[in-house]
Each structure stands twice: as structure tokens, then as C-alpha cells.
Amino acid sequence: MLEKSFTEVYDKFKLQFYRKVFELVRERDGSLSAMEAFSLEVIKMLDHPTIGQFADFLNISQSNATYKVNNLIKKGYLERENSTTDRREYHLKLSEKFYNYMALLSSYEQRVMDRIKARFSEEDVNKFDEMLQIISNELMPEFGK
């Protein structure tokens, strides 16, 4: 029962995300491809990674990662930020253009959050939040906190 319910909710969020990505992906100069949109999501979740960290996470070559990153920089979705500890290294920073794009994608998540708060008691919402934090921080250690 739990597995089925979890999978249904997770799949619905994925479907909504994919729908929005493909709505935003256009065949014109400067638009994002689906792969670029997913790459930006990974960079966001890795929180200012280096190109090496990005490549390692996706299990792709450094040159392939560099190619993807350079395209995203050209399109204005990504910026390079020099490392404070090693001037030869830089971190990937998401641009304002990316956050404008993300606002369109996250509207569904906010709608679901509003529905949760309207449907359940404050106590239930707080318990659900606590459970989600435990799941994220303790039960999914391979992705850090």
C-alpha cells in the first residue's frame, strides 16, 4: 500500500515536471533542450558544483560536461563563479534567467502544498513535514542533506 501510494504521488510530480519542461522547450535560438533542462535541475540540486562534480554525478566525461555547461552559459541560464580556495577552479552558479524559468515549473508544487494545507490539520501538516525531512536527511543519504 505505502509503496503504491508513494509511487503514484512521485509519478504525478514527475509527469507535471516533464509536461512543463516540454512546454518550455522550443525549437528556436537560445531555447533549452530537454537534456539541458534536466542538466540545470541536476546543477541546482548539487548546489554550486564544479564541472568535475557535475560530470561525476552524471557519470559522463569532463569534456561532455564542459560542452553542456558552455551551452548553458551561452544561453544565459548558468554562470561561472571563481572558487575562493583555488583560482583555477570555478563553480557553476544558476542565473536569474534560470530562476525565472524555475518559477514556471514550481507553480504546481506550490498548488499541491496549498491543497495539503487546506485539506489537512496543522498538526498533520507539521507531522508530514517532519516525515519528509527525515526521509530527505536520513533515509536518502546518497544525496546529502
Where are these regions (language model features)?
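N-terminal leader segment of winged-helix/HTH proteins
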Residues: 1-30
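C-terminal regulatory/oligomerization modules of transcriptional regulators
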Residues: 1-4, 122-145
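N-terminal positioning helix adjacent to the helix-turn-helix/winged-helix DNA-binding module
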Residues: 2, 35-36, 97, 124
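Hydrophobic alpha-helical segments typical of transmembrane helices
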Residues: 5, 39, 112-113
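Hydrophobic recognition helices of helix-based DNA-binding modules
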Residues: 13, 17-21, 65, 105, ...
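N-terminal helix-turn-helix DNA-binding core of bacterial DNA-binding proteins
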Residues: 22-63
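Residues within the DNA-recognition helix of helix-turn-helix
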Residues: 68-71, 131
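Charged, amphipathic alpha-helical coiled-coil/dimerization segments
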Residues: 71-127
